[in-house]
């Protein structure tokens, strides 16, 4: 982060990558966040839930612990949708009142194993009473652009995911699940996949 700052006027964001284990409790993350925040080279931090394992209940304990450790530095949320938690965990984080940004995916780039879809997330935040000062017309235009591109390229859009509790046990990201299943099928060992 020091080198980035020496090279120019870039913002440096520290990632707190979330997982479930006996070691990774709120105190673990708060201690690590405090160390990152103590650096003058780190401008802000975010809770990165790439595995989509952070429940709304966990956000309600984890985010305040981290925020207490980082003081005035901004804290953002980056919650993937793979098992259905992304939108509700992001909303729970915003409801705490100190989250400075909710990371989203625009149009077809949202949902699935990605981040909450931008227009739906904005609507949900507003429905919950949050002020979201963005240009709705511009957001709609951006979404339309990505939808047109996805259709033209034949790319599948992200779709809302149902809750799947098995991910809380095996913690294998969906981006790993698909090729793993294919490889097991190719080896005639597909029956091992649900294990």
Name every feature range the model reports, one short phrase each:
Residues 1-195:
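Catalytic cores and adjacent flexible loops of soluble metabolic enzymes
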């Amino acid at each position: 982060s020091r080198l980035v700052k020496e090279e120019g006027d870039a913002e440096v964001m520290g990632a707190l990558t979330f997982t479930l284990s006996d070691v990774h409790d709120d105190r673990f993350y708060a201690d690590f966040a405090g160390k990152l925040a103590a650096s003058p080279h780190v401008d802000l931090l975010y809770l990165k839930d790439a595995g989509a394992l952070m429940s709304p209940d966990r956000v309600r304990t984890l985010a305040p612990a981290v925020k207490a450790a980082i003081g005035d530095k901004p804290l953002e949320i980056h919650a993937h949708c793979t098992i259905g938690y992304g939108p509700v965990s992001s909303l729970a984080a915003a409801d705490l009142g100190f989250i400075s940004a909710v990371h989203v995916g625009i149009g077809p780039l949202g949902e699935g194993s990605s981040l909450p879809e931008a227009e739906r997330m904005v609507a949900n935040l507003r429905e919950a009473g949050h002020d979201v000062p963005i240009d709705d017309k511009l957001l709609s235009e951006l979404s339309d652009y990505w939808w047109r591109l996805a259709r033209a390229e034949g790319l599948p859009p992200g779709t809302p995911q149902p809750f799947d509790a098995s991910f809380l046990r095996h913690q294998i990201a969906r981006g790993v699940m698909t090729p793993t299943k294919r490889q097991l099928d190719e080896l005639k060992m597909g029956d091992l996949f649900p294990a």
